[in-house]
């Protein structure tokens, strides 16, 4: 599986875990992006947008289902912690 994109060497374990999901058959297609202090440090994508279909692209649009609930909860907890 060819992994596309960029990854700061300090975040090599993120790339390794991302690639490992494909090697273990856990992913058909995926992307991951991480910023640190507003600077992109990981921007990776690989696989297929639909199994047996078009390759995943940097701008492939996906349904994130209920991920917003988790992000909202984490945001509220961080704000509460900061007072």
Where are each of the predicted segments found?
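Short, conserved catalytic-motif segment at the N-terminal edge
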Residues: 4-64
């Amino acid at each position: 599986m060819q992994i596309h994109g960029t990854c700061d060497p300090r975040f090599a374990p993120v790339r390794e875990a991302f690639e490992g999901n494909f090697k273990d058959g856990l992913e058909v297609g995926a992307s991951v992006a991480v910023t640190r202090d507003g600077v992109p440090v990981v921007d990776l994508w690989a696989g297929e947008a639909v199994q047996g279909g078009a390759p995943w692209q940097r701008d492939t649009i996906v349904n994130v289902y209920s991920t917003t609930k988790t992000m909202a909860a984490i945001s509220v907890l961080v704000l509460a912690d900061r007072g």
